[in-house]
Amino acid sequence: MPDIGLEEVEIIEILVSINEKIAPEQGLITVEGDKTSMEIPSPISGIVKHIFIKIGEKIKTDALIMRCEVENIDFHVKKKEEICLDNNVLNKVEKNFKKDIFFHATPLIRRLARNLNINLYDVVGTGPKNRILKEDLDLYQSNIKENLIEEKNKINFGDSKKSKTKELELSDIQKNIGNNLHRNWMNIPHVTQFDEVDITILEKFRQKYNNEKRNQKKTNENITILVFIIKVVAYALEKFPIFNSSLNINNKKIILKKYINIGFAIDVNNDLFVPVLKDVNKKNIKQLSSELILLSEKARTRKLNIEDMTGGCFTISNLGGIGGSWFSPIINSPEVAILGISKSQIKPSWNGKEFIPSLMLPLSLSYDHRVINGAYAARFITFISRVLSDMHFLIM
């Protein structure tokens, strides 16, 4: 049993059998210890002759696990004059040989490095006995990207190009948002799920309601489609509580929130603000509409305070008024998901007898894959689509 940095491990799987031919780096056994499991690879090629361990047994470093018959090796020694090499070549061979000897990485890490096109010799291991961990690969990849960005920023366009370019200063808001977006994109494994929902009935009701209020001269405030989406999302968060959570990376725990506050992104002269509607699940459509209008106006006049922009559980990014079909919104940490809304379009849909025109709204759901799996996300966005297509589900 090789030294993998753990005092004792349990055998949970034996991957080979007696008389089986094995190759270097082929997995022999799978062990588990200290809340992690890994494959132990073969250092040689040969044939398995005896297996000394069994599943469930606990073993320590240097324990005998298998006996193998090593394939024949050609020990033919060439003549003295044939093996005289330049000192520089010998030094290079010796250097690489030493690297191979003291190289510490599990097969999983080796495969991951190959997939990421990372040379493990360039990675500094921070695990026990300098073992290379997944976090070391993440750090190495992050440093590479930062170096590329630095090099890109150093591009010199030359004197002939200077008259054809113009530099613009980023506003303080753009700088802060840019830093947050970069950090969230680098640290959160994003997955984006897409769906399309029929809002024909909902839009007819919305227009009818606004026309009646306008004719009665009770209000000049129109209820937007966004208000209905916010209310439905709050309902979905109650049904799918993992979406209303945060991930505590330090102690590896998910923090579920007992309140539902929903932020909505708003663009003001290329500056992005995310006001937060509080306790959405406890308010009706008219209350939410009034608060949405108030916060939107405060954003446009740049009068939002800290209370208006903190405490969010989930964010909605609405680009429907601008255009576009789909996009991948970036999660607003410490939240674990964000819903993107695009421009609705009339499309043909089949009602079982014929094609009819339907108003279809594109939805884009990005979520943190460390917390939420694909099936759970699919159920969440499907639930939102079903309720938006028939608001009667809100009273169920």
Swiss-Prot record:
Any Gene Ontology CC annotation: cytoplasm
All residue ranges annotated as the Peripheral subunit-binding (PSBD) domain in the record: 104-141
Molecular function via GO: dihydrolipoyllysine-residue acetyltransferase activity; lipoic acid binding
Reaction catalysis annotation: N(6)-[(R)-dihydrolipoyl]-L-lysyl-[protein] + acetyl-CoA = N(6)-[(R)-S(8)-acetyldihydrolipoyl]-L-lysyl-[protein] + CoA
GO biological process, one term: pyruvate decarboxylation to acetyl-CoA
Keyword terms, alphabetized: Acyltransferase, Lipoyl, Transferase
Top-rank lineage group of the source organism: Bacteria
Keyword Acyltransferase carried by entry: yes
Catalytic residues, chain numbering: 369
Pfam (any one): 2-oxoacid_dh
Gene3D superfamilies in alphabetical order: 2.40.50.100, Chloramphenicol acetyltransferase-like domain, E3-binding domain
Cofactor note: Binds 1 lipoyl cofactor covalently.
Cofactor: (R)-lipoate
Sequence ranges assigned to domain Lipoyl-binding in this UniProt record: 1-69
N6-lipoyllysine sites (modified residues): 35
InterPro entries: 2-oxoA_DH_lipoyl-BS (IPR003016), 2-oxoacid_DH_actylTfrase (IPR001078), 2-oxoacid_DH_E2_comp (IPR050743), Biotin_lipoyl (IPR000089), CAT-like_dom_sf (IPR023213), E3-bd_dom_sf (IPR036625), PSBD (IPR004167), Single_hybrid_motif (IPR011053)
EC number: 2.3.1.12
CDD domains found in the cross-reference section: lipoyl_domain (cd06849)
Function comment: The pyruvate dehydrogenase complex catalyzes the overall conversion of pyruvate to acetyl-CoA and CO(2). It contains multiple copies of three enzymatic components: pyruvate dehydrogenase (E1), dihydrolipoamide acetyltransferase (E2) and lipoamide dehydrogenase (E3).
Family to which the UniProt record says this protein belongs: Belongs to the 2-oxoacid dehydrogenase family.
Subunit structure of this chain's protein: Forms a 24-polypeptide structural core with octahedral symmetry.
Protein name: Dihydrolipoyllysine-residue acetyltransferase component of pyruvate dehydrogenase complex
